[in-house]
Amino acid sequence: MSQIKLIVGLANPGAKYEGTRHNAGEWLVNELARMYNTSLKDEAKYFGKTAKINTVNGDVWLLIPTTFMNLSGKAVGALAHFFRIKAEEILIAHDELDLPPGVAKLKQGGGHGGHNGLKDIISALGNNNNFYRIRLGIGHPGHKDQVAGYVLSKPAPQDQQKINAVIDEASRCLEILFKDGVTSATNRLNSFKA
């Protein structure tokens, strides 16, 4: 596998969206930054907040786009093109309706599953979907007509606890990924349930 050089946490910007389910990817990147004693700074030329962490495998960029979710590719594309980071060296953390809270899955490739952030990133990378993703379960409201309101609202306290637990586990699994590779990290994360 290629070494991961960029980890992106998808979110919508602004106080209005803080703490909403759609921002789960951002929570993971913030936790990773905290583990490495750094904080993300606004970087206008990458349309997001960035930081660089030093792992056992070398430097890894952290990015939280400050565009709206459906324009996430603008930020990912800008940073990836500038540093010549290939799609398979990118990991995207995002909310996942098809997994329950407290569950996360690490995988490479695949479609966008209706996720507008992923859709825009695939497009910005020249229709290349070969990046890794950590799908953070947020559960499903039950009917597709309720999805927009659901992802833009805050989780119930018991769901938030489960999401926090899986984010904690996912951040540990990223350390395993840096040290032992994607297979070890995938096996551990994909069998976890809060």
UniProtKB/Swiss-Prot annotation:
GO terms for biological process: protein quality control for misfolded or incompletely synthesized proteins; rescue of stalled ribosome. It holds the Pfam family Pept_tRNA_hydro. SUPFAM superfamilies: Peptidyl-tRNA hydrolase-like. The record marks D95 as: Stabilizes the basic form of H active site to accept a proton. GO terms for molecular function: peptidyl-tRNA hydrolase activity; tRNA binding. The keyword Hydrolase applies. The keyword Cytoplasm applies. TRNA binds at Y17, F68, N70, N116. It is found in: Cytoplasm. The record marks N12 as: Discriminates between blocked and unblocked aminoacyl-tRNA. Monomer. This is Peptidyl-tRNA hydrolase.
